[in-house]
Amino acid sequence: MYKYVVEREIKRYRSHCSNIMEQLRDMLNEKYDINTQFSLVGSGGDSRNMVTRNGDGSFDLDYNLVIISMPNAFWDNLKRLKDTVRDSLNRIVGNTWFSDGKDSRSVITSILHFKDSPKVEFSFDIAILARNSNGNLCRLIHNNKGCWNESFAWNEVPSSHNVKDKADALKANGLWNELRAVYLDKKNMYLSRRDDNHPSFIIYIESVNELYNRHF
């Protein structure tokens, strides 16, 4: 079952990852004219610790890299966009203990390796997002069915356009611990169902919307 990770265990990893993300943001802007903003998903934000681990397993931090603007060449070729982000990340982590970014369906994952242990203890995931005309966030999804049959598309995240405002309202009204409980229950519910289609970011949005609608 999922449980929360204590803040003191998260702090140093968050500092390292934020530094890498700052370098990534700057490199994308300077080399490719890709203007982005990055943020920790609500499950990892400062003073909002909702980072979880399954049992005694490893944990990760989830980052959103939101596209603000970029040349049409990238809008028209989403594979090129994801490859550019991953290649840029690899240049940055090349001199660290983090591995090159591994591509998956919805994120790029970098793993921290320890010299004294081959066991993976920490990783961080980067999801690439952009907003559609409705203001909702859309995640870049890589549907890989083999080298000759793959596609890239934006997948809308429902009810995500004002989730930050709702989360701020919950926190301001002393409801953050209740949100933590809802979020953890949902994480364990999807775990019991063996549902891999609800990453932390989606569960966080579901939890915020559910609790906000309950109280406001």
Specify the residue positions occupied by each region the protein language model found:
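Right-hand nucleic-acid polymerase module
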Residues: 117-216
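Helical scaffold of the NTase/Pol beta-like nucleotidyltransferase catalytic core
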Residues: 1-42
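Active-site nucleotide-donor binding segment shared across nucleotidyl transfer reactions
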Residues: 28-61, 65-75
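Conserved catalytic core of two-metal-ion nucleotidyltransferases
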Residues: 28-32, 79-134
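UBC/E2-like fold recognition across ubiquitin and ubiquitin-like conjugation systems
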Residues: 3-4, 54, 69, 204
